[in-house]
């Protein structure tokens, strides 16, 4: 599934590498697309509309999205973030985060008579449905993802007797299956495409009949942001990724930048976290942001770089995203 239209990259390349621009103008390469994806936009708006409709406090299980600024802003507005449903007063309103939850969490909420709104990204829900479908057909499901991530816990919880977590290529040797003719891989939606394909290749060496998911599990936005970073990284002395450390897709962007040729790459939540020493001798800085990052945080980094002489900002556009997800049915009438 994709909402992306391929576009020209449009980087004005130097004759040599970015480092050879020492006598030229400092510049910023600004990745497009970046920032909010459709699932994050839907999740954040779900909480905002729930506040408007029901008033504070409302409760959210885990972080609605993995971004410190978003969570802090919503907390200031009266949202209470909890780890588990037993922390929510009986009968209160609880929103499930964009990362999805297992059936056991739904059951726990119902047992406490909680009113619930599900802000799970529809692309995560798709993976849940795949897990249920292949479990019904008695497949061994190899779920590629990061141990402890909420999305992985939710997906695995749909079919705990059939799902095995595969946390990267190094985990492949420990995988065991019952019937090598009935094995399928699924994945967390926010992984590095390249590393996931490495893991799949290793799995296929062990299990030649390994089936692919019916459609891409890594979401369009994750892929698009990685493609944009790959396009600009070879020209960059430095790539700054705006995002939080618990954001899987943001962390992956740092890895992608380094693997694609950037000389250095750092993850920051705010412009104030940019170390001026990072800019010593730098002529080309790439900027991108994770899928849960509001644009105001990117603008803060651009303004900071402008103060350090990086006045020339060139967009690097590799796709145009148009996808919009409907709000949960409880709130659709409230959307403007």
UniProtKB/Swiss-Prot annotation:
| Pathway it works in | Isoprenoid biosynthesis; dimethylallyl diphosphate biosynthesis; dimethylallyl diphosphate from (2E)-4-hydroxy-3-methylbutenyl diphosphate: step 1/1; Isoprenoid biosynthesis; isopentenyl diphosphate biosynthesis via DXP pathway; isopentenyl diphosphate from 1-deoxy-D-xylulose 5-phosphate: step 6/6
Task: Give residues annotated as binding dimethylallyl diphosphate.
Answer: 66, 99, 149, 247-249, 292
Under Gene Ontology molecular function, one entry of this record is: 4 iron, 4 sulfur cluster binding
The keyword 4Fe-4S is annotated on this UniProt entry: yes
Q: Which cofactor does it need?
A: [4Fe-4S] cluster
Question: At which positions is (2E)-4-hydroxy-3-methylbut-2-enyl diphosphate bound?
Answer: 66, 99, 149, 189, 247-249, 292
> What residues does isopentenyl diphosphate bind to?
66, 99, 149, 247-249, 292
Binding annotation for [4Fe-4S] cluster = 37, 121, 219
- The reply on keyword 4Fe-4S is yes
EC number(s) given by UniProt: 1.17.7.4
Q: Which reaction does it catalyse?
A: isopentenyl diphosphate + 2 oxidized [2Fe-2S]-[ferredoxin] + H2O = (2E)-4-hydroxy-3-methylbut-2-enyl diphosphate + 2 reduced [2Fe-2S]-[ferredoxin] + 2 H(+); dimethylallyl diphosphate + 2 oxidized [2Fe-2S]-[ferredoxin] + H2O = (2E)-4-hydroxy-3-methylbut-2-enyl diphosphate + 2 reduced [2Fe-2S]-[ferredoxin] + 2 H(+)
State the UniProt keywords alphabetically: 4Fe-4S, Iron, Iron-sulfur, Isoprene biosynthesis, Metal-binding, Oxidoreductase
Q: What does this protein do?
A: Catalyzes the conversion of 1-hydroxy-2-methyl-2-(E)-butenyl 4-diphosphate (HMBPP) into a mixture of isopentenyl diphosphate (IPP) and dimethylallyl diphosphate (DMAPP). Acts in the terminal step of the DOXP/MEP pathway for isoprenoid precursor biosynthesis.
Tell me the protein family, please: Belongs to the IspH family.
- What is the name listed in the Swiss-Prot or TrEMBL entry for this protein? 4-hydroxy-3-methylbut-2-enyl diphosphate reductase
